[in-house]
Amino acid sequence: MAGFNYGDYKKKERDDPESKYELEAYATSEVPAYLQNHGFGTMAPSAMADNALVDALNSIRLFQLWFGALPYGRIAITQQPEFNFGQSWPTLVYLPVSAFLDGTQRWSLLGGNAFRFAEFIDEVTPHEVSHQWWGHLVGWATYHDQWLSEGFADFSAGLFLQATEKKQDKFDQYWERARKTILEKNQFGQSANDAGPVWMGLRLSTFRTGSAYQKLVYSKGGYVLHMLRSLMWNPKTGDQDFIALMHDFVTTNTGKNASTEDFLAAVNRHMRKDMDLEANGRADWFIREWVYGTAIPSYRMEYSIAPADGGKVTLTGKITQSGVADTFRMRVPVYLDFDGNLTRLGSIGLIGNQTAPEFRVILPKKPKRVILNAHHDVLAAESVVSGN
């Protein structure tokens, strides 16, 4: 199998000493005929090739940090005529013509829908570039394991948004959209998650759940990795444990078709002590629940804040998990909002439908808000907070 683009292309090149990569961007000097026929014949995708080149460069730099270096040394970003379709081959990425148009041009084409379509444009380049790792450098063993490609690519697009946006908003909105994609009911009263676990892959799609494959293998698969990153976050070293896991998984499986169990083996090598919710030194529970299972928890936190000595305050709270089996395990984080800056206070481990023991913490001052699951750290049906 081979991939290629054929046409009258303009080429732009850039050598990046930081990533040690040669980047090329190819775009046409005119839009496809179907756009010319709608009065947009003067648009020139090649004039916007720099934007695609910069997004690809930033993606390569970011993902080499998180996943490790690539062996290829070059990548070509190429425009193809479809408006909303991208695809990746080793060293060759197809991007839709829409990715080579600026916001004004997209507004001319789409009107008010341009704002919604902008989300796709923001995400398509990092998603497709990340397939240089997920799908090419590391393959997948069977259809059961394809979430290791598409889910990991969706996670990578989220990383890109977090790294390139000044505020956290787009990153949080990205995972909220994913949550709704997974859980919202269709016209038959069924959600994608009702179709089955991520592990079922292509078999998820039926007459009543036609888009379940896309919504689970891509969106929920990405969410699995997002949750794992949150579980492995360390207040002293940040994401370093998770980054070490991802480097290990890539190094161990380069040139191989990895399975879900291969990924679990890497997780078990790098798991934090507070992830040992079955007291067996393993994180099998996490993959069992989120890749092989379909349970979606709900959370409720009740808290109170009272004055303490020295101008400080005492935060007292309790968290309840519900809507799951008695064996379902998870940790959910609590955040504090001090003047718009979120601080992660810690996480609470829960098993089954239960209320965890009450926690009590002395704080230097009263927070503006106490937030549960602030960055969609856990895929939840709801995360409700009440208190003063």
Which sequence ranges carry the predicted segments?
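Hydrophobic helix-coil surface modules that form long, contiguous segments used
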Residues: 1-126, 167
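Acidic/His/Gly-enriched intrinsically disordered linker/tail segments
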Residues: 119, 150, 154-227, 253-254
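Zinc-dependent metallopeptidase catalytic helix centered on the HExxH motif
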Residues: 57, 61-62, 112-180
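Beta-strand-rich binding/interaction modules
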Residues: 237-238, 279-280, 294-373
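Amphipathic alpha-helical substructures
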Residues: 214-313, 317
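Short acidic/polar inter-strand loop motif in beta-rich domains
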Residues: 374-387
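Active-site rim elements
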Residues: 42-50, 141-143, 208-215, 249-254, ...
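Surface-exposed patches in mature extracellular/periplasmic domains of secreted proteins
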Residues: 66-80, 140-145, 167-174, 237-245, ...
